[in-house]
Amino acid sequence: MQEFSLSTLLEMTVGLASGANNEERFHRLLDAVRKAVICDCVVLMSLHNDTLTPLAMQGLTRDTLGRRFVVSEHPRLAQICSADLPVRFAADCPLPDPFDGLLLDSEDDLPMHSCMGLPLHFGEQLLGILTLDSLKPDAFDHLSPRSLEILAAIAAATLKMTLTFSELENQAKQTQLRLEELNQEAWSRDSVEIIGNSGPMLAMKADIDVVAPSQFNILIHGETGVGKELVARTIHQRSNRKRQPLVYVNCAAIPENLLESELFGHVKGAFTGADRARMGKFALADGGTLFLDEIGELPLSAQSKILRALQNHEIQPVGQDRVQTVDVRILAATNRDLKKEVEAGRFRADLYHRLSVYPIYVPPLRERKGDLSLLAGYFVEQARRKLGITQLKLHGDVLSQLIQYPWPGNVRELEHVINRAALKAKARQRGRPVTTLKVEDLGELQGPRAAMVEPTAQDEPMLGEWIGELGLRDATDEFQRHLISETLTQADFNWAEAARRLQTDRANLTRLAKRLGITVSRSHSIERSR
């Protein structure tokens, strides 16, 4: 049995505490481990609840960092986590290796022949694990148990030190943030996670860190599909209201005649059909946070009522004489430029200033292409779990294909593309131990324009007339009328199918169609009132 020399141990410990950041400290640790133990790949993971999160890795595809490994779903990881001492798996062990097929610079489904895992304990607490894999059988048999215990102790001390630094930083900022390494934010297993380390995402996360603990109203703005609701949930989770409700309202989905009742509630008998009293969204969010999604779609009449609630912190349910006080923090989201809407007279300036005390911009995916590998890995692991696939990996050409695509539907579109591709890959490779998601599984990457019919020669002059004779708003409305009408016709006048093709939800589509004067007659024909 081989023991580590004193010089090897000193080399492993020197400099581990001097890294400029968590990522650098962890990679120094992995560099030292690979000098001491020859292996093809090594992964450091932290444990939270029943989920292992990769903090740093060497030798595996980069999308591995975006994956989350539920311990109960991976027998080898479960065995390592439940052990007190390092675990070595036999070359013929039947348990699946979670990293099979993920070896860097290899398109083959190469299995790992040697696998070893070190539980990282600090006192009685299991902080995480360190895994080492090799394509060479019996690669770790020569290492003595004592050497592996020392290696585990050094790794655990490094991980504990780094986690402690993060905890102290969190306390200094007076937030409830549980910071994971690589500047990614994670909640508990049943929560959500903001993935990304690109410059625009780090700037957005910094804004969240600054404003979340405050009581300020926040305007979250960005394109459709960028994750504005996720940002709102993150802000609520970081605030001192996190133990109180977060109430969601889609402003575009509520008919105008029901808005007041939906937001402020009503008493029994307030109007026809009000057979019982009902609390409104403001009352339900009392003490917590109210998220007003698609705030830019509210009609002016509803905007004035919300403004009064924000100014006075009072609401008056429909049919009730007295007012009641509420303590609500407002988070609003929109994909519109509200400054321009104010200038055009479609949005109240006083409400805009009340809402945008601290605006947060959520960047589109095309501005954060550096996050694509992490996002792809995250969605691939989610798809693997949903579809019950033992192992799902990305072919090397897939990431380059994803990076070249402009992603008009942003992160939401990426998630849907990977889910569809994973389903196709599973059907095509049924029965294989490692399922590979290939370029052909992506299909034809198309954005919202895919739902449009090709313009005919007869149509083209009309499009030119829009540009020449209409203002921007009117031209946009006319284009939307044309697009919705054509899509409805192609979808056999099925609103749900048309909404799917246009990558929106049915409520938003019907509301927009109503504003544009589009209706479908009983004889299944498009009627326009404008």
From Swiss-Prot:
Domain of life, source organism: Bacteria
Domain Sigma-54 factor interaction: 194-423
SUPFAM superfamilies: GAF domain-like, Homeodomain-like, P-loop containing nucleoside triphosphate hydrolases
Name listed for the protein in its UniProt record: Regulatory protein LuxO
Native organism: Vibrio cholerae serotype O1 (strain ATCC 39541 / Classical Ogawa 395 / O395)
The keyword Transcription regulation is assigned to this record: yes
Residues in coiled coil: none
Cited function: Involved in the regulation of different processes depending on the cell density. Acts together with sigma-54 to repress, perhaps indirectly, some genes.
Single GO MF descriptor: ATP hydrolysis activity
Transcription regulation keyword on record: yes
Leader sequence residues: none
Sequence positions that bind ATP: 222-229, 285-294
GO biological process: phosphorelay signal transduction system; regulation of DNA-templated transcription
Alphabetic keyword roster: ATP-binding, DNA-binding, Nucleotide-binding, Phosphoprotein, Repressor, Transcription, Transcription regulation, Two-component regulatory system
